[in-house]
Amino acid sequence: MTRYKAIISYDGSQFQGFQRQSHARSVQEEIEKTLTKLTNGKEIKVHGAGRTDSGVHAYGQVLHFDLDQDRDLEKLRFALDTQSPEDIDFISVEKVSDDFHSRYTKHLKTYEFIVDIGRPKNPMMRHYATHFPYPLDLDNIQLAIKDLIGTHDFTGFTASGATIENKVRTIIDASVRYEEDKNFLIFTFTGNGFLYKQVRNMVGTLLKIGNNRMPVDQIKTILEKKDRQLAGPTPAGNGLYLKEIIYEDK
């Protein structure tokens, strides 16, 4: 068996998420169906690095799968790219060692979250940016976002009822920039892992801080108290993008 690693991008607006589901369209299912076509009916299991939610997009999702024969890499990439639905693109395919696992091999993830702050909003971006048409103090957001950097227990930023026990994660970079030509705020977070809805809840909190409905030091309070009720609302997933996954060299 040969293990392959692929980097893909997808428009998440017509998917219920990456992970296969019984009664909804998923990225995993579409790719597995394509692999079945390319291997004369064999069932091939795909493993993704990140389980993006409904409506969430990806520039650089990573997955791996095993095939029982050696394939020319560009021919395989081209076949996967052209046989998959139009909202999935295969950027690259490479051979990896048998102990590589897209999810469990140590890595860093980078997410972007795009907020359309235009009044009126851009209707062409309704599936690709979350709209927030209220006044914002960007300086306050830039001050507050720095408090997320470091190793913290992010219980206060995960979804209520999350069952995972260890909620300690490390964020090595967190920033926000304003794109004046589009009237977008773009939040960027890089870390060793993120809890369920963590990125969206961090953005929702930062928007409240920027709108002066929370104090600038609210991030510190949430991290200290570990209380989801102290954080902001969860924005829609349409503004969230899995941008890049970088694996640690052995």
Curated annotation (Swiss-Prot):
Signal peptide: none annotated. GO terms for biological process: tRNA pseudouridine synthesis. It catalyses: uridine(38/39/40) in tRNA = pseudouridine(38/39/40) in tRNA. InterPro entries: PsdUridine_synth_cat_dom_sf (IPR020103), PsdUridine_synth_TruA (IPR001406), PsdUridine_synth_TruA_a/b_dom (IPR020097), PsdUridine_synth_TruA_C (IPR020095), TruA/RsuA/RluB/E/F_N (IPR020094). Substrate binds at residue 111. Its EC number is 5.4.99.12. Keywords: Isomerase, tRNA processing. GO terms for molecular function: RNA binding; tRNA pseudouridine(38-40) synthase activity. The active site is at 53 (nucleophile). It comes from the Bacteria. Pfam families: PseudoU_synth_1. Homodimer. Formation of pseudouridine at positions 38, 39 and 40 in the anticodon stem and loop of transfer RNAs. This is tRNA pseudouridine synthase A. It comes from Streptococcus uberis (strain ATCC BAA-854 / 0140J). The gene is truA.
